Amino acid sequence: MCTPDENDYKTSTDPDTSANTNHTLEKKKRKKRKNTNVACVNCSRLHVSCEAKRPCLRCISKGLTATCVDAPRKKSKYLAGIPNRELPMSIQPDLPPRKIMIPIYNNSSNSSLNVNNMGEQQKFTSPQHIVHKAKFLSNAADSEYSILSNIIYQDTLSNKIPIDILYSNTNSTSNSTIGNSSNNSPTGTNTSPEETEMEKIRQLYSEQRANMPPHPYPSSNQNVYSILLGPNSAKIVASQVNLFANHFPLVPVDSADNSLNFKRLLPRDPSEKSSQINWDSSINQYYLNSETVTFPELAIPLKRRKNHLVSVSLESCSPDAANIKSNVGWEHSLRYSTPMEIYTSINAPFSHTPGFHHLLVYLKHRFNQQDLVKMCRSIAEFRPIFIACSVTLTEEDMIFMEQCYQRTLLEYVKFIAQIGTPTCIWRRNGQISYVNEEFEILCGWTREELLNKMTFIVEIMDDESVRDYFKTLSKVAYRDFRGSEKMKVCRLLSPIKGKIIHCCCMWTLKRDVSGLPLMILGNFMPILN
């Protein structure tokens, strides 16, 4: 038998028993830590506890409400290089923290505004929140990064502030004013987040265009948009608004005779029907051109002869039509026809910010919230690549990028004129930059209608093709560097309402010297069966 001393010795040296005992003792010693709040300046100076509410109860009792603000904290390493006067002031609403609400997707604008308001109020209930973005060396890169951030974070006010405004000393008062207005108003700010966003971005790129010469109104000579911009086309044309800085989407029109006579201003022969189809019955072949008969007008004849082999031929054009078409007033398109003019005349970078902004607004009006989130995710993949490629680029580098774009476009235009394939070229923000005559014949939209204003490639696609567009964009531009991708089915919208052109589209991506997507070339071929 074991003596009592031996039993005590065994119990104390048992590893399992000793571990359980130590764990129990640690539990007793360990107590729940209280959540600590950032003390105000007055409480921090006296080393007393404080609360999250501003002004705190102690400052109210002492009459120090005017100076009751958060005490400055030690800056993080990533903020070490930024002076204190340039750091944005934190916005502290006087509202209690609200419960997190799951937004309900709704197409109505009122519900989206309410969701944005809730997101903004929740974002700034944390007193430790610090707004910070990477500082680019180029203003053009700054503004483009800001609009990309705005697309990704739709419910966050801090990410809607462009970086130039964020680091501007003159706007620190406006930032604090936003916070004060949220304190005084029981439901938040008086202006909606979308209005605030549009106002800030409008100020951003209006300054960039201040020194530019005024653009002539695109439709001053020929009224091509009098019926192509929806029900308010006449008002838009009469207002003389700048269609390069403001976006109005193209809208297909009902045509009783399934032709484009409603938009042909100068037919070849006024005594004849401008859309009289030229057809050779002996070989069952149709003849098309960009002025009288286009491919959308063949929808009904092709449907009648769907069981027969049909060929389509393009009528030969005059030698003058093959000349390079440039326009100095079209900043987004080919501006000059010689390399010397490109290198000597382009002295400012092209701003993609207005294009991204208006693209987002257009998608909001056209698609529901669920589709919009998926599209924004595809655009969001561009942001880290944009930071890596352009954070060290200067303003001179961005000017050189635009010169490279114009020089590359000039060479491609010469090549495209020889191959005869319907081709459309657009920038990385989706803005159409160039189309050839074959593309005009295929889709029915003329070159002037597409390039005489801010037009996006997604405007002339149906809904399903737009969804595939952003998926293809993320593949070809951000995931792999093969430089080409194929859309098996791309449905183009024609000016005739209800007439859709089924095509197969091959993408070719061209990058600049820094690796950023420079331009996208789309070759479209119709699917006849």
From Swiss-Prot:
Gene3D superfamilies: PAS domain
Region Disordered, residue ranges: 1-31, 174-198
Limits of the PAS domain: 408-480
One GO CC term, this protein: nucleus
Low complexity bias locations: 174-193
Coiled coil residues, start to end: none
Signal peptide location: none
GO molecular function, one term: DNA-binding transcription factor activity, RNA polymerase II-specific
Matches recorded under Pfam families: PAS_13, Zn_clus
Compositionally biased spans, kind Polar residues: 14-23
Keywords, alphabetical: Activator, DNA-binding, Gluconeogenesis, Metal-binding, Nucleus, Transcription, Transcription regulation, Zinc
CDD domains noted in UniProt: GAL4, PAS
Cellular compartment(s): Nucleus
DNA-binding region(s) in UniProt: 40-68
Record-level GO BP terms: cellular response to starvation; gluconeogenesis
Annotated function: Transcription factor which regulates nonfermentable carbon utilization. Activator of gluconeogenetic genes.
Similarity annotation: Belongs to the ERT1/acuK family.
Protein name in UniProt: Transcription activator of gluconeogenesis
Organism expressing this protein natively: Saccharomyces cerevisiae (strain JAY291)
